[in-house]
UniProtKB/Swiss-Prot annotation:
Gene from which this protein is expressed: der
KH-like domain location: 354-439
UniProt-annotated binding residues for GTP 2: 184-191, 231-235, 296-299
Annotated organism of origin: Synechococcus sp. (strain WH7803)
Function: GTPase that plays an essential role in the late steps of ribosome biogenesis.
Binding site residues for GTP 1: 10-17, 57-61, 120-123
Protein name (Swiss-Prot/TrEMBL): GTPase Der
Length: 455
């Protein structure tokens, strides 16, 4: 059984995201003075005592307004309550009971999820009890005065949360999930792709750019293994983003790339590869992440039997630094090839984590040298490649011992990398090659030691 879920519910700007960050000991949830910063439901890992659980943060609930994303936010909150063991209902003790609080209480009475009432912004313990007493009128049980920003009262609240969680014995042991980040420019279909993958409305979809502000974590099982999918905020040029919630979401997106095992770079089939797509691809390669390139909106392209081949050639010419990444043409709208993403991503992760023995590496290098010798300078000095060994994975990294790294130009270095890929695979992952100068006698001695260790 998966870890139990605790849902955070409340109207806008009562401090839900601040409480999430407090419960999860992080700053993942975006906190900003502007109401409605959180729109989709986002997941983080929380713990208290000897229990681990998931905390799901939902958008601010408003029932007397159907403009913009408010109906979708209500739908996201209802979905969060369906999977939660308990809901924490957050209200603002300084403002007192509002009509919005009463509407939320009425909404919760129609749900099957039990609720605990937390009265936030009770910074003074003495005044907090008096402020909390007013909220008995909501009919949601005992109100617990807390200060999300300072942590006061949260221990007692969490003790009550644990009483609603299923027995720990039902959770079982679980394999660590693969972290998959869905990244791309605004409005290329990232959230639609996430919803198509999950088979439910996990993220709000809109033609308005910047709909997704947070990174949205989704846990599921595919290819017989657990995955954690992260739908990131659309990443634009920095100069086109004002300092505010969207800025923080983009910063969170770059962090999602850093903590991912594999990235799905979503390209709009109608737009082709833009300069911003190239920058994102460069970021993936720079961070050493496995990658699958997904060309979305394929259903909207007029095509014949040659279109896919021609378009792939055109796209790869502009994404030349991701020439090792598999490319998949999909439609989030129709679901075409969406399920194939996991098979390609799983293979990329496997290659990203792969290790190869020194003897096998040197067989490939020997073959490469037989086909093409290292370059010779005008002064008659020739590069010598003594041996190579894999020194790390995630991404696979190799140190190549040579007489002088300066004798190996970019052209020959690219040739060696291509030969390693042709001989050993590593589809879907970048490689890092380190060229290190060494005297021949020392290199031969070190090679013998390496081979003896691997026996």
């Amino acid at each position: 059984m998966a870890r139990p879920v605790v849902a955070i519910i409340g109207r806008p700007n009562v401090g839900k995201s601040t409480l999430v960050n407090r419960l999860c000991h992080s700053r993942e949830a975006i906190v900003h003075d502007e109401p409605g910063v959180t729109r989709d439901r986002t997941y983080q890992d929380g713990y208290w005592g000897d229990r681990d659980f998931k905390v799901v943060d939902t958008g601010g609930l408003v029932f007397d307004d159907d403009s913009e994303f408010l109906p979708e936010i209500r739908e996201q909150a209802a979905l969060a309550l369906e999977e939660a063991s308990v809901a924490l209902v957050i209200v603002d003790g300084q403002q007192g009971v509002t009509a919005s609080d009463e509407a939320i209480a009425e909404f919760l009475r129609g749900q099957r999820c039990p609720a605990l009432l937390a009265v936030n912004k009770c910074e003074s313990p003495e005044q907090g009890l008096a402020m909390a007493a007013e909220f008995w009128s909501l009919g949601l049980g005992e109100p617990y005065p807390i200060s999300a920003i300072h942590g006061a009262g949260t221990a007692e609240l969490l003790d009550q949360v644990l009483t609603y969680l299923p027995p720990k014995s039902e959770e079982g042991d679980s394999e660590e999930p693969i972290q998959l980040a869905i990244i791309g420019r605004p409005n290329v279909g990232k959230s639609s792709l996430l919803n198509a993958i999950c088979g439910e409305q996990r993220a709000i979809v809109s033609p308005i750019r910047g709909t997704t502000r947070d990174t949205i974590d989704t846990s599921l099982v595919r290819e017989n293994r657990p995955w954690r999918l992260v739908d990131t905020a659309g990443i634009r040029r920095r100069r086109s983003v004002n300092y505010g919630p969207e800025f923080f979401g983009i910063n969170r997106s770059f962090k999602a790339i850093e903590r991912s095992d594999v990235c799905v770079l979503v390209i709009d089939a109608l737009d082709g590869v833009t300069e911003q797509d190239q920058r994102l691809a460069g970021r993936i390669e720079e961070d050493g992440r496995a990658c699958v390139v997904v060309v979305n909106k394929w259903d909207a392209v007029e095509k014949d039997s040659h279109t896919m081949t021609a378009m792939e050639k055109e796209l790869r010419a502009k994404l030349y630094f991701l020439d090792w990444a598999p490319m998949l043409f999909t439609s989030a709208l129709t679901g075409q090839r969406v399920d194939s993403i996991f098979a390609l991503a799983a293979l990329a992760v496997e290659q990203h984590r792969r290790r190869v023995s020194t003897s096998v590496v040197n067989e490939v290098l020997k073959e490469a040298l037989s086909w093409r010798s290292p370059p010779t300078t005008r002064g008659g000095r020739q590069g010598r490649l003594y041996y190579g060994t894999q020194v790390a994975s995630r991404p696979p990294s190799f140190t190549l011992f040579v007489n002088d790294p300066k004798l190996f130009g970019d052209t020959y270095r690219r040739y060696v990398e291509r030969q390693i890929r042709e001989g050993l695979g590593f589809d879907g992952t970048p490689l890092k090659l380190f060229w290190r100068g060494k005297q021949q006698r020392d290199a031969e001695r070190d090679l013998a030691r390496q081979q003896n260790r691997q026996g």
